[in-house]
C-alpha cells in the first residue's frame, strides 16, 4: 500500500459537434485539410478520454513516473504527425509514458526519460494539467509545433523566476520514429519578469534526413504571456 499512496489519478473527457455553413458535399475533411481535430462537417465526435497515472518527484532523490492513456477520434491525426501511418481506426494512444528522477544536483535536477509532450509552443496537447478551453487550434499547432518527443530531458530551476531545460530526443520535430542514426537536441529558457509578464524561449534541432541523408532542421519558438489585470 505504501507503494501506491503517492500515485495520483486524473482524467477528463471531451466530445463535440462540428458544423460547416458552406455545407461541403463530402463531410470528411469538409472544413479543409488545414484543420487538425475539427475537420469533419456536420459530425458528432467523442474527441478524447484521458486517464493519467502519475507519481510526482517533489523532493531530491525521489523516483516517479507518468502515464497518459488516451482514447478518441483525435489520436489518428496525432499519431500521423509523430511519424506513423494514418489509421482512422486506431483511436488509442499512449500520449505520455516516462520515468522521473529528482537527481541530487544543486536544488534538484528533474530528469524524465521516455515519451513526453513537447516543451515548444503556446498550444500543447497536455491533458488535465494543460487544459485548452478552445476546441479548434491555430495553424502553428497542427502544422509546425511538434506534439511529443521520445528521449530524455532535464530541467533545473536556477531561481524562483528562472528555469532551464535541455533535451536529447529521436527527432527534432517530434516524430517518435528515428529515421537516422543522429539524435536531436532541444532547450528552453523560462523567465518570469513579473506577476503579469513571463517569457519562454524554445529551440529544437537536428537531422531529419532519412538514412544517411543530411537534412538539418531548427525550430525556434518564443511565448510571451502578458496579464492585463
Where are these regions (language model features)?
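Transmembrane beta-strands of outer-membrane beta-barrel proteins
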Residues: 9-15, 63-67, 109-111, 164-166, ...
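Oxyanion-binding "anion nests"
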Residues: 217-229
